[in-house]
Amino acid sequence: MIEERDLVLSNGIHCIADIHSELYARLKKESQAATPWVYQKQYGKFVTYFVAVIIFLSLIKKLAFMYYDSSEEFLPEKKNSPTTPSVFLARIMTKLVAFNRYICYRKFPTLIFSYLGIPTSVGTFLVVMATTLYTLLYCFVPHPFYRPCAGFGSPPLSVRAGIMAISLVPFVFSLSGKINVIGWLVGLSYEKINIYHQWASILCLFFSWVHVIPFLRQARHEGGYERMHQRWKASDMWRSGVPPILFLNLLWLSSLPIARRHFYEIFLQLHWILAVGFYISLFYHVYPELNSHMYLVATIVVWFAQLFYRLAVKGYLRPGRSFMASTIANVSIVGEGCVELIVKDVEMAYSPGQHIFVRTIDKGIISNHPFSIFPSAKYPGGIKMLIRAQKGFSKRLYESNDDMKKILIDGPYGGIERDIRSFTNVYLICSGSGISTCLPFLQKYGPILHKTNLEVITLDWVVRHREDISWIRDEMCTLSNNLRQLFLDGKIVVRIYVCSDSTVPGIIKTFPQTIDTASDQSDLAKREKDTEFGQDDTESNSTFDKSNNEYKGLITIIPSKPDLNQVINDYQIGFRNCFICSGSDSLRYTVGNSVAGLQAKVFSNKNVEECYLHSESFGY
């Protein structure tokens, strides 16, 4: 019987047996007066205010850089503009920014932190930890955690933890979208802020359990398991709380790095189904307690607005196009484990560094994957994608024998917020298929170098095998043809590092205009091996016609794995420097730490004003 286990307070009142007594009612009223149940909803507002402040500060930073970039004299009409920031304010700003970047650009060991789902960027880590600390303090510092008896009201710890969890839901859903209002405000694309979506979800899950446990603990403390069973049967709130926390736990488990790594496509389909179940069950559970359902109303309004905007502007409902209009992509194998997709004509505007989501119209239509895009040299007006065969979608595409595929395009997304034209030096650092991100910057800004502040564009590309260079053969030939003088003047520098020592016929260090494939290819391979890369080879070769000699020395191929830290430190840093990197985790780790170290030059060298880093990753 429950009465056999009945908590007795110091004043002699029983928490269960005396529940209908006048003294019990008076003590309940005193407990509510001391810690009002209705006040607990303020803790949800405290969380919202904190996140709003972070977003506001990020917005200020974005607007400041937009103003700063627009005031630069990289266009004739901007010269001698009265809107140029004062020298004093500019110096203060550059020093503060450099100090911030000195800390925030640094990277933690990628393998360990990524495996644990912890942000690898120091800057992101600090924001996440600040938010975590703030919410933990607001949840656990206020007392009391419990009321003397459960009948006096819900445990204050449970109520405030629950309302804090609900207040995070709008941010969780908003940050999940490929188009989201928070990303637009802070100037980050969705793949950059996806880590905040993950950690907002983790905090939401944590506070959900903090909400649940005090109810269970107090019921057991007062009347044992029988009391818990009675509360379960009598309270609809208890029963309705199970589905949302179950959905939330399944969302967390399926989102763990190890689960995403091995079951990515299952995760993609399961994620939105569980999210819908979580939202509906949570709405039923909280309505209308403390008006907390209004957080969920805001969630659905923002989420649907983002979804509609994405479909209408980026996706399959674009005005002037038929619903889910498909396009044809040419498919070809361009090396071991690499597929080339070319769409000859695209009806969308895009910027360097952006990517699209591709969905093939076949049995794999439910799968869509992101790929960086760049202009195709072979088909002007077309776009090209390089896809490394790994698992799922990319592996099926690589193993298919199709020369053409019907695809659906969603995008473009991502890109860089800063105006590249305002920098003096641009350094493009990439490995493998990361060239898809970096090359379009050279393609776009190389031809207009003389119209901007840009003085030098440097591309350093690390590949495993020499044959990988053929991925962008046409594009590099076009660039070396059209921008030959810039190459010769050292205003465009291209270095390709080949980690292995394999040699494939038809790939040469200087990207000749024409190649006679009927020639003795083994002789060519031997000559390449014997040649000192980066130097002019004056020996004639029957493989190439006379025009080939024009391209000697324009592009340097180095047959070794580079020390990227040394490569970056050897750069002739200019006045305003932009570093763009894309590739492996180890590359981004090295580049991040190296560019963080370069911030010291902003303090020590008056001829260096800025070292900005933009990195791309497909870890989302």
From Swiss-Prot:
It comes from Saccharomyces cerevisiae (strain ATCC 204508 / S288c). It is an enzyme of class 1 (oxidoreductase). It is found in: Cell membrane. Heme 2 binds at H211, H285. Belongs to the ferric reductase (FRE) family. Residues 1-45, 129-167, 216-237, 287-292 are extracellular. Its main location: membrane. Its cofactor is FAD. InterPro entries: FAD-bd_8, FAD-bd_FR_type, Fe3_Rdtase_TM_dom, Fe_red_NAD-bd_6, Ferric/Cupric_Reductase, FNR_nucleotide-bd, Riboflavin_synthase-like_b-brl. Induction: By transcription factor MAC1 upon copper deprivation. Heme 1 binds at H197, H271. Signal peptide: none annotated. This is Ferric/cupric reductase transmembrane component 7. Residues 321-419 form the FAD-binding FR-type domain. Cell surface metalloreductase. May be involved in copper homeostasis. Its EC number is 1.16.1.9. Residues 161-320 form the Ferric oxidoreductase domain. PANTHER family: FERRIC-CHELATE REDUCTASE, FERRIC/CUPRIC REDUCTASE TRANSMEMBRANE COMPONENT.
